[in-house]
């Protein structure tokens, strides 16, 4: 398949939404398709320092017939997926990983002074993510589900949903910065030569946390919130017609 079939001006978030398997290519190339999903493929490649034509070839090689996106027209189903797949993972992993990060910093800190900064970054990240998913489930998702059912929203609910979506996107940016800091402190999740099995596990789980967060944020920023804002706009147009 020619790489000409992949338009370099299309936003990377839109491409990932259309073909979820593209995210494997984006992850490998360190292309930000979640918080930076509005950037065109061309711009995203420049930002990541990778060759555009090489990335287009890799994307074109993916068999899209076997990798189409799930039908997320039903936003309630997408909300359920986010909660059951990503929020539940965070509820279990964040506290467990915190204990491991503390242990590794204590045991290996003398030989790896960067672990103190890593622990600080993680202890900033974990409560932020916990509060974020609580707010989504209690404040944001109920309004989206009501909107998805076709129920009428008050002006206050419409305004609050728009404000909450912007706040959630800002939270995602803050989370991305902390994860980027963790990635830097671990040299891109490189396992040190003197790492014990627990140290190795910590690195692997931090890497997995970042990858899951990329997918999580992509589903919200580029699918759920986009569709919710479209429904809000359609509702305004319907009432004004």
Go through the PLM ranges and name each one.
Residues 1-241:
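Small-residue-biased structural context
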């Amino acid at each position: 398949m020619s790489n000409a079939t992949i338009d370099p001006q299309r936003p990377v978030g839109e491409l990932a939404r259309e073909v979820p398997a593209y995210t494997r290519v984006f992850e490998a190339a360190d292309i930000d398709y979640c918080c930076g999903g509005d950037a065109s493929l061309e711009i995203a490649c420049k930002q990541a320092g990778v060759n555009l034509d090489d990335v287009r070839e890799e994307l074109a090689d993916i068999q899209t017939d076997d990798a189409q996106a799930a039908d997320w027209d039903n936003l309630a189903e997408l909300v359920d997926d986010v909660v059951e797949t990503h929020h539940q993972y965070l509820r279990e992993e964040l506290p467990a990983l915190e204990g491991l990060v503390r242990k590794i910093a204590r045991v290996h800190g003398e030989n790896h002074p960067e672990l103190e900064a890593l622990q600080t970054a993680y202890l900033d990240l974990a409560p932020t993510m916990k509060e974020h998913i609580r707010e989504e489930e209690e404040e944001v998702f109920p309004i989206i589900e009501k909107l998805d059912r076709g129920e009428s929203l008050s002006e206050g609910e419409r305004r609050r949903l728009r404000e909450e979506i912007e706040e959630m996107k800002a939270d995602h940016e803050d989370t991305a910065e902390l994860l980027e800091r963790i990635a830097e402190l671990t040299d891109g999740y490189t396992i040190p030569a003197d790492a014990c099995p627990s140290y190795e596990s910590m690195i692997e789980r931090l890497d997995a946390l970042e990858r899951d967060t990329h997918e999580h944020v992509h589903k919200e920023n580029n699918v759920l919130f986009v569709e919710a804002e479209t429904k809000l706009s359609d509702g305004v147009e319907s009432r004004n017609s």
